[in-house]
Amino acid sequence: MAQGKESVSVVEMEGSGNGPAVEMRHFETLFRLLPVGLCISALVLMLKSEQSDQYMQLDYSNVDAFRCLAYANGICAGYSLISAFDSMVPVSHHISRSWILFLLDQGITYLMLAGGAVATQVLYVAYKGDEKATWEQICGSYGRFCNRAGASVIISFFALVCFLLLSLLSAYRLFSKYDPPIHGGAKLEDQTTAQI
């Protein structure tokens, strides 16, 4: 069974204030702020996605998938901002705090993935239509609406990549606190012969 390593405080590692721990904390803070701009840009573009003519008025709020992506971008921007402020604080990363950050990063990543996937599918149908379901493509007539929604989806996927990398970072931070499991019998034999 894996045992937790003794955690070393980031403050203790910093020493004089210069070192790899401080640089890593600054990098993580900046990297957690990057999705804020991306998510807000995607959110604003989605909110501005509207077009009307004499037959129909299209708005992002008419399409559940686009509303879902707008909510996901808002939630993820807020989380990213809060987690960036949290990463600025020089405190030790205890196992419980690392688990919470890991699980939240995973949840936010999956939220962005789900919102982006659903919006991409709806956008695909809007561009191509679906003959079997007799759904006509609408982007030929409502190009401005589709272009803004499409740009929002693309920016959301860039934010998703940032959240994926943050998930990897938090996973590394969490699981590096544990000893590796005993592999096969080689390590067990070494321990047995050392006791003899």
Curated annotation (Swiss-Prot):
What Gene Ontology cellular-component terms does the record carry? plasma membrane
Question: One Pfam family this chain carries?
Answer: CASP_dom
Q: Which residues lie on this side of the membrane: Cytoplasmic?
A: 1-26, 90-98, 170-196
Major localization listed first in the record, in broad terms = membrane
* UniProt superkingdom: Eukaryota
Extracellular face residues:
48-68, 120-148
Could you list the residue ranges that cross the membrane? 27-47, 69-89, 99-119, 149-169
| Key words of the record | Cell membrane, Membrane, Transmembrane, Transmembrane helix
Query: Does this UniProt record's set of keywords contain Transmembrane?
Result: yes
Entry keyword annotation includes Transmembrane:
yes
- State the compartments where it is located: Cell membrane
Membrane association type: Multi-pass membrane protein
Q: How does it assemble?
A: Homodimer and heterodimers.
* Family according to the record: Belongs to the Casparian strip membrane proteins (CASP) family.
This protein is called what? CASP-like protein 2A2
Biological source species? Picea sitchensis (Sitka spruce)
